[in-house]
């Protein structure tokens, strides 16, 4: 009897320990993510950003900061997030453990695991854009990692920093590539840290920039992933490996540059890659068609899991630069790297036949009716009252305790009421006016479990999305929900064990 009780107590201890600690994320192979910049004159609300991500089935994003509003909106969505420490904060974090710990507490611990933060990007292209911060870069990375370690999150959240491929000298043939030796005092300890923590090297890969700077040496088709005949492929004379596109050659140059410093097992994560859809007069190849061609082919190439010629079959996950056109940036091409405009309309519709579902939805045919930005709240309330009264729509989902009650404000409730009325009239544009306080948008206003009429996410008016426990071999995650189901499973097992022991006794 004593041995049975001892066994039960031991099992209880092990199971409680297991349920208390999240497990490291499983390797999901190569994936496509998207960068989200905020240099827009009319930045969409975080709930609109998340609605667009959901509509396009984007499951991985990278932020250039740790915007709390967006991190809150991303909670319980299952979208995996890389957050960033801006370059102008590096000095403080690199010089002070406590500053790094406070940053992690405020921007990671406050949101995780509801928001699935997978990595912290410490600065961006620091060695080429902020040379005075180079001496503290590795210290900043280590201080952030130490703060994650103290919170038992170091196995769950990676720490790295994006490098520009301009640091790689003699990039072709790739087998001869090496990092700028003048920066080895920073790069060697950086790579040593990445290797010791099982992290990845973040690299920004832009065939467009290399193509522009090559003065015609790099063919356009080679930069765009377009098919080229075998006799036009680039051949590495040292390895006899053939390259059919610039992207693979640049990634392999990164692998070889690391190997030159005796680091051969650090994976590469491409944190930025893309092509502008407009440019200045000296950028004739910054066109809609070329941007569409490059990004469509990039997505197809990454998701085919072919890897690179040096490392075939090894995942090279990539984040497209970028989700929105950033109209406040200087220079025409800098304003036009986005896949979408601020209102959610696609700049172009990607050609992604047989390439999975990510970014494959044409949002141009999806329209919604929402409150016009800056509309008078009294007029909004009057229009809301009309829609729920004489307008004869079902407003029960925005009552207290129901699926669309939160956020509890007139704009959110008006959005639901206006859109429901609009869809009940068959998407009649005249129905989306409400005395001038409403307007039509292509951005899905659904949020959390509140799914609007016509949403690709569900298509039901204000009803909650079904949430079921993931299967034992599920490769997806849903933040707190998955932890909840896991905990329920643990306690179910404990209950069975206790009952069995009781029967034996």
From Swiss-Prot:
One of the record's GO cellular component terms: plasma membrane
EC number: 3.2.1.39
Reaction equations catalysed: Hydrolysis of (1->3)-beta-D-glucosidic linkages in (1->3)-beta-D-glucans
Major subcellular site: membrane
Cysteines joined through disulfide linkages: 369-432
Record PTM: Contains two additional disulfide bonds.
Propeptide: 478-505
InterPro entries to which the protein is assigned, alphabetical: Glyco_hydro_17 (IPR000490), Glyco_hydro_17_plant (IPR044965), Glycoside_hydrolase_SF (IPR017853), X8 (IPR012946)
GO biological process, alphabetically ordered: carbohydrate metabolic process; defense response
Source organism superkingdom: Eukaryota
PANTHER family listed in its UniProt record: GLUCAN ENDO-1,3-BETA-GLUCOSIDASE BG1-RELATED-RELATED (PTHR32227)
Protein name per Swiss-Prot or TrEMBL: Glucan endo-1,3-beta-glucosidase 2
Species this protein is from: Arabidopsis thaliana
């Amino acid at each position: 009897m004593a041995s049975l009780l001892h066994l039960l107590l031991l099992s209880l201890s092990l199971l409680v320990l297991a349920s208390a600690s999240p497990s490291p994320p499983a390797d999901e192979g190569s994936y496509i993510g998207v960068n989200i910049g905020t240099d827009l004159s009319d930045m969409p609300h975080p709930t609109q950003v998340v609605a667009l991500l959901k509509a396009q089935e984007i499951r991985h994003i990278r932020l250039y900061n740790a915007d709390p509003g967006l991190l809150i909106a991303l909670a319980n969505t299952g979208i995996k997030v890389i957050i960033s420490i801006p370059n102008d904060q590096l000095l403080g974090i690199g010089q002070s453990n406590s500053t790094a710990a406070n940053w992690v507490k405020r921007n990671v611990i406050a949101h995780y695991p509801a928001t699935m933060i997978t990595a912290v990007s410490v600065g961006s292209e620091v060695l080429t854009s902020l040379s005075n911060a180079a001496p503290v870069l590795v210290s900043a990375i280590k201080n952030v990692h130490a703060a994650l370690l103290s919170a038992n999150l170091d196995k769950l959240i990676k720490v790295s920093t994006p490098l520009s491929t301009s640091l790689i000298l003699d990039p072709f043939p790739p087998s001869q590539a090496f990092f700028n030796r003048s920066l080895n005092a920073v790069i060697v300890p950086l790579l040593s840290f990445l290797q010791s923590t099982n992290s990845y090297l973040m690299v920004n890969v832009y065939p467009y920039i290399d193509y522009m700077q090559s003065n015609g040496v790099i063919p356009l088709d080679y930069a765009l992933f377009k098919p080229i005949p075998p006799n036009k492929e680039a051949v590495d004379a040292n390895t006899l490996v053939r390259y059919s596109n610039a992207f693979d050659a640049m990634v392999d140059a990164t692998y070889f540059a690391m190997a030159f410093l005796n680091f051969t097992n650090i994976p590469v994560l491409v944190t930025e890659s893309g092509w502008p859809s407009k440019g200045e007069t000296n950028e004739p190849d910054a066109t809609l068609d070329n941007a569409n061609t490059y990004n469509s082919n990039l997505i197809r190439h990454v998701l085919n899991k072919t890897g690179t010629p040096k490392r075939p079959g090894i995942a090279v996950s990539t984040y497209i630069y970028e989700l929105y056109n950033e109209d406040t940036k200087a220079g025409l091409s800098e304003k036009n790297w986005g896949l979408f405009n601020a209102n959610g309309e696609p700049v172009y519709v990607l050609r992604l036949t047989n390439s999975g579902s990510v970014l494959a939805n044409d949002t141009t045919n999806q329209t919604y009716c929402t409150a016009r930005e800056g509309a008078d709240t009294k007029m909004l309330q009057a229009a809301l009252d009309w829609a729920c009264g004489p307008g004869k729509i079902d407003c029960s989902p925005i009552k207290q305790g129901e699926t669309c009650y939160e956020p509890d404000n007139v704009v959110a409730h008006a959005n639901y009421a206006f859109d429901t009325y609009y869809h009940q009239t068959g998407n009649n544009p005249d129905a989306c006016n409400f005395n001038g306080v409403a307007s039509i948008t292509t951005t899905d206003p659904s949020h959390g479990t509140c799914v609007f009429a016509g949403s690709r996410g569900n298509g039901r008016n204000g009803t909650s999305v079904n949430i079921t426990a993931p299967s034992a071999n599920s490769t997806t995650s849903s933040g707190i929900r998955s932890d909840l189901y896991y905990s329920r499973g643990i306690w179910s097992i404990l209950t069975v064990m206790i009952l069995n022991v009781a029967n034996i006794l």
